[in-house]
C-alpha cells in the first residue's frame, strides 16, 4: 500500500487503560505509522465509568456506553483525535458529531470456553458454575445446558480468566479475539462458534471514531477500513438499533460475505444470522437472511422485522424489566 502524504505531525488516540484496550490502540497506531511514514501517533489513556466500577453489575451502573462515553467526549472536546473501541461495547446511537470512520479487518468472532478440568461445555457436570458478564452468553449457556449455574463476573480479561485457572469457577467464557490478541488463547479448551453459539453484535471487530468535520483524520484512517468487515458490522448494528437494544441485551448476530455454494446462495451476498434470547435461556427467536452486499442497512432492517414477527419483543421486554 502506498503511503499518504500527511500535513499533521501528531495524531492522538484515546484508549481505555486495560491491557487489551492498549494492545488494540497500539495495533491501530502501528497500522497508521505504516500507512503514513512520518506521522507521530501517541496514546492517551482515558478512564471510563466501566473501568472505575469493576464490582457492580453492568446494567446496575448504566448499561450502554460504560466503556465508551468518556472517550467519545474526549474526541468531541479535542483532547484526542480518534477513539479506538471494541465494537461490541459501542452503542448504536452516538453523538452526531462523531463518525465511525474505519473498521479494520475482523478477528475470529467465536466465544471461548476455559474449563481446565472438564474441557468442554458438554462434559461439565450438572451444577457446574460458569462465569460470564454477558446476558447473551448466559442465555445461550442456559439454553444449551439448563442444568448448570451461571455466575456473574467482572474485571479485565486476565482477572476473569484466572477465575477458571485458579479453580474458583468450573469454567469461564470470554471472547476468543481478546484472548488471541493478548496471546492467552492457549488456555482455551473449547471454541464456541457460530452458528451453534452466536457472537455479540460487533464481536471481534474494532471501531475507530473521529470528528465528522475532521477531514484530515478521516483521510488518515481510510486505509485501515476493511469493506467486508464494515458492511457486516453495519448489518449487525442496524438490527440491534432497530430492536432498540443495547450491548447488554441477550441478542446475538453474525454477518459475513458469502458466495455461491451447494445450497444455491447467490454470489455477492451478505448473510446475517441473528437471535434474541430470554434472559434465562428458556426461549429464543432466531432467523437467517441474505441480501446484496451493497445494502447492509436494509438487511439489518429486514432482520429486525423478522425477529419481531417471530416474537422477539416479549423476550426483550423481560430483559428490560430485569435490568431496570
List each model region and its residues.
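Small-molecule-sensing regulatory modules
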Residues: 2-53, 60, 68, 143-324
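Short, well-ordered beta-strand segments
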Residues: 12-14, 83, 101, 131, ...
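Short, structured active-site "lid" loops
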Residues: 56-82
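Alpha-helical segments flanking ligand/cofactor-binding loops in enzyme cores
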Residues: 73, 121-122, 162
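Short, Asp-centered acidic motifs that coordinate Mg2+ and/or phosphate
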Residues: 80-84, 170-171
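A conserved helix-loop-strand patch within extracytoplasmic ligand-binding domains
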Residues: 87-90, 96-148
Amino acid at each position: 500500500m502506498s503511503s499518504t502524504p500527511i500535513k499533521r505531525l501528531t495524531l492522538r488516540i484515546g484508549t481505555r487503560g486495560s491491557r487489551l484496550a492498549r494492545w488494540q490502540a497500539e495495533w491501530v497506531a502501528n497500522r497508521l505509522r505504516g500507512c503514513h511514514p512520518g506521522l507521530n501517533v501517541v496514546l492517551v489513556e482515558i478512564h471510563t465509568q466501566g473501568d472505575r466500577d469493576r464490582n457492580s453489575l453492568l446494567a446496575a451502573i448504566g448499561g450502554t456506553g460504560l466503556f465508551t462515553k468518556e472517550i467519545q467526549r474526549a474526541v468531541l472536546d479535542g483532547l484526542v483525535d480518534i477513539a479506538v473501541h471494541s465494537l461490541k461495547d459501542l452503542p448504536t446511537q452516538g453523538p452526531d458529531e462523531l463518525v465511525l470512520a474505519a473498521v479494520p479487518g475482523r478477528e475470529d468472532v467465536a466465544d471461548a470456553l476455559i474449563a481446565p478440568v472438564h474441557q468442554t461445555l458438554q462434559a461439565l457436570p450438572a451444577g457446574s458454575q460458569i462465569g460470564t458478564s454477558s446476558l447473551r452468553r448466559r442465555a445461550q449457556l442456559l439454553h444449551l445446558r439448563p442444568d448448570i449455574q451461571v455466575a456473574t463476573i467482572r474485571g479485565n480479561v486476565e482477572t476473569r480468566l484466572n477465575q477458571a485457572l485458579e479453580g474458583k469457577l468450573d469454567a469461564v467464557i470470554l471472547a476468543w479475539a481478546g484472548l488471541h490478541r493478548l496471546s492467552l488463547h492457549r488456555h482455551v479448551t473449547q471454541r464456541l462458534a457460530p452458528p451453534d453459539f452466536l457472537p455479540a453484535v460487533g464481536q471481534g471487530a474494532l471501531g475507530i471514531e473521529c470528528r465528522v468535520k475532521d477531514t484530515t483524520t478521516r483521510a488518515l484512517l481510510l486505509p485501515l477500513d476493511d469493506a467486508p468487515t464494515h458492511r457486516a458490522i453495519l448489518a449487525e448494528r442496524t438490527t440491534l438499533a432497530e430492536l432498540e437494544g443495547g450491548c447488554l441485551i441477550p441478542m446475538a448476530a453474525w454477518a459475513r460475505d458469502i458466495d455461491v455454494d451447494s445450497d444455491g446462495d447467490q454470489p455477492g451476498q451478505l448473510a446475517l444470522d441473528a437471535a434474541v434470547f430470554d434472559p434465562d435461556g428458556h426461549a429464543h427467536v432466531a432467523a437467517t437472511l441474505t441480501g446484496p452486499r451493497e445494502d447492509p442497512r436494509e438487511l439489518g432492517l429486514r432482520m429486525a422485522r423478522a425477529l419481531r414477527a417471530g416474537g422477539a419483543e416479549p423476550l426483550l421486554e423481560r430483559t428490560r424489566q430485569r435490568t431496570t
